[in-house]
Amino acid sequence: MAVGKNKRLSKGKKGLKKKVVDPFTRKDWFDIKAPSTFENRNVGKTLINRSTGLKNAADGLKGRVVEVSLADLQGSEDHSYRKIKLRVDEVQGKNLLTNFHGLDFTSDKLRSLVRKWQSLVEANVTVKTSDDYVLRVFAIAFTKRQANQIKKTTYAQSSKLREVRKKMIEIMQREVSNVTLAQLTSKLIPEVIGREIEKSTQTIFPLQNVHIRKVKLLKQPKFDLGALLALHGEGSTEEKGKKVNAGFKDVVLESV
């Protein structure tokens, strides 16, 4: 007798849909905290898979880089064309403590600065801060009309541009090498270095729209938890940092 399939038997349904599990149920949300250099310390939230077995969520969070508009950090639309990069260095509970990782301009702002009838001056320098962070700083500037000038164009001679560029590099090296990374951030917010360059180059050739357009972190020293906690107000729960005034001045200690 031949043995075959019994068509009367009910068949099991093929391709049964598996129970869909929402992937977000396996993830945790963490709050990103900016250093107290910025006025608004609440940057936003990020998520990661929960710690399971040998996999620790903190290891996956450390080193993450987030890009935030400086307008959000300072609560002012005047800074909307600048972007700040923050790097997660430490995890404390549900809070991620970050440090400054870089600065950049938005592309639309850079394009709006470039115009006809003027010369563009760019300079960059690699310099080490007093707390051993190696940075590459990029500056941009444009020539402007001299006093009582009738001529429409403001082009500068190559020799003048070389002098201006040399002065820009000299100022950037001086302003960055004598301060810590936190102090440099306080200088970048009100654009102290740009104003110093504009003031110092008046005798060579008048400039306008002088900006530090980019700061790139090349190398950082060994991680120091104490320094990071001090940068964040030693783990304080305050959600607001100290506002940086436009007339920023270095603090000089009279006595130690």
Swiss-Prot record:
GO terms for molecular function: structural constituent of ribosome. Keywords: Acetylation, Cytoplasm, Ribonucleoprotein, Ribosomal protein. One of its GO terms (biological process) is translation. It comes from the Eukaryota. It is found in: Cytoplasm. One of its GO terms (cellular component) is cytosolic small ribosomal subunit. The keyword Repeat does not apply. Its main location: cytoplasm. The modification N-acetylalanine is found at A2. The keyword Lipoprotein does not apply. It holds the Pfam family Ribosomal_S3Ae. Component of the small ribosomal subunit. Mature ribosomes consist of a small (40S) and a large (60S) subunit. The 40S subunit contains about 33 different proteins and 1 molecule of RNA (18S). The 60S subunit contains about 49 different proteins and 3 molecules of RNA (25S, 5.8S and 5S). Belongs to the eukaryotic ribosomal protein eS1 family. This is Small ribosomal subunit protein eS1B. The gene is RPS1B.
